C-alpha cells in the first residue's frame, strides 16, 4: 500500500542520516559529510542495502536481487536483502564484509573490513548472528551461526565466534573466548580495538 511505502521511505532517509552521522563521528579519516555521502563504499553499500530491503519487503524481489548483485560487484560488500540492519551503523573500509540473510544488526554498531556474519552450513531458517546495540566487530572477525553478540560487546580482529557473547564482554581468538570487558558501554562509538584485561 502507499502508506507502507511512505513508512519505508522515511525509514530509509532516517537510516541514511544516522549512518552518515555515525561515519563522521567515528571515522577519523572522514573529512566531511559530502565526501562520505559520495565516496564511502561502506556507507554506500549500506544505503543500497536499505533500498534492496525496501524492494524485498514490497514484494519486488527481482529489483532487490539486482541491487544486491550490483552492490556486491561495485563495493565488494555482500549484504543479503533480507538482513535486518538498524540505524547509526558504520561499515568501515567495508571490503569483504558478508552479512547473511537472517542476520540482525541493531542500532549503533561498527563493523570493519573482512567481517562475516554467516551460517554454519546447510541449515535453513533462522541461522545467522544477532548483533545487539553498541557492538564493535573488528577487522576479519567471523561470527557463524544463530548466535547472539550481546549489547556493548567487542569482537577482536581475526576472531572466530561460534557461541553467544555476553553483553559488555570482549572476545578474542580462534575459537573466540572471553578475554575481558570493553573500556566503554558502547565500543562501537569509541571504536577502541585494544583488548582490555
For the regions a protein language model found, what residue spans apply to each?
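Extended, small-residue-rich solenoid/repeat segments and analogous flexible loops
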Residues: 17, 31-38, 43-97
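Short, small-residue-biased leader/transition segments that mark boundaries at the very start
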Residues: 1-8
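A generic structural signal for secondary-structure junctions
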Residues: 56, 176, 183-184
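Short, charged, intrinsically disordered terminal tails
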Residues: 184-195
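Non-catalytic extracellular/periplasmic "stalk"
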Residues: 10-14
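Conserved alpha/beta enzyme-core scaffold
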Residues: 23-26
